[in-house]
Amino acid sequence: MSGHSKWATTKHKKAVIDAKRGKLFAKLIKNIEVAARSGGVDPDGNPTLVDAIQKAKKSSVPNKNIESAVKRGGGLEAGGADYETIMYEGYGPNGVAVLIECLTDNRNRAASDVRVAMTRNGGSMADPGSVSYLFNRKGVVILPKGELTEDDVLGAVLDAGAEEVNDLGETFEVVSEATDMVAVRTALQEAGIDYDSAEANFLPTMQVELDEEGARKIFKLIDALEDSDDVQNVFANFDVSDEVMEKVDA
């Protein structure tokens, strides 16, 4: 299991009481707007919109905010911005490769925010292509464990193209090719299994094992990057042991 998955799980548990909740809501709303603009407002014909709405609902974003975001994205309500996706590449402390996915209406602001966060937290920017080759784009579906076993999940998703099921503690992570993600999510739904999120992520092909000090440094960098309103996702190729994670969480 990747260190970043553990970190994301830890943050997920804290999300409801986290001081950044408003910032999280804004990013989820932005996802919905962009999905509606690019694929239309009808969820039946827009699986990306379905998944953006699902993730927002699971994070307790109010329904009225979700509905407004869909309307803005579809041009049915004023106020929508023209967002573009930009990927930045860099290295964090201990040579950890970092991919930063931005969704922004101001390219210069996004670039500045990312550069400042990187340089102030032991990181450095890298040329396009110098880091991204260390990652593969995969479909990742996160589902609450509840009473489910790993075999329950495997039985539901194996024929839909799932490559692996990872136990993240309180959740399961189902990994597939990005093109198979909707089929995996649909298979879970048909089996009556609820899911928290389904999205295409960049997963590392190799990982850097970090000790407690290294873990704290990379988490500080990720936090600084995610503080930017323009940064939607941060992907990194590090791993930490359960023992180290417990110390960091303490």
From Swiss-Prot:
Disulfide-bond pairs as recorded: none
Keywords: Cytoplasm, DNA-binding, Transcription, Transcription regulation
One Gene Ontology CC term in the entry: cytosol
GO aspect biological process, one term: regulation of DNA-templated transcription
Compartments, record wording: Cytoplasm
GO molecular function annotation: DNA binding
Keyword Mitochondrion: no
Pfam family, one: Transcrip_reg
SUPFAM superfamilies linked: YebC-like (SSF75625)
InterPro entries named among the record's database cross-references: Integrase-like_N (IPR017856), TACO1_YebC-like_2nd/3rd_dom (IPR048300), TACO1_YebC_N (IPR049083), Transcrip_reg_TACO1-like (IPR002876), Transcrip_reg_TACO1-like_dom3 (IPR026564), YebC-like (IPR029072)
Family membership: Belongs to the TACO1 family.
NCBIfam families: PRK00110.1 (NF001030), PRK12378.1 (NF009044), YebC/PmpR family DNA-binding transcriptional regulator (TIGR01033)
Protein name listed in UniProt: Probable transcriptional regulatory protein SGR_6014
Lineage: Bacteria, Bacillati, Actinomycetota, Actinomycetes, Kitasatosporales
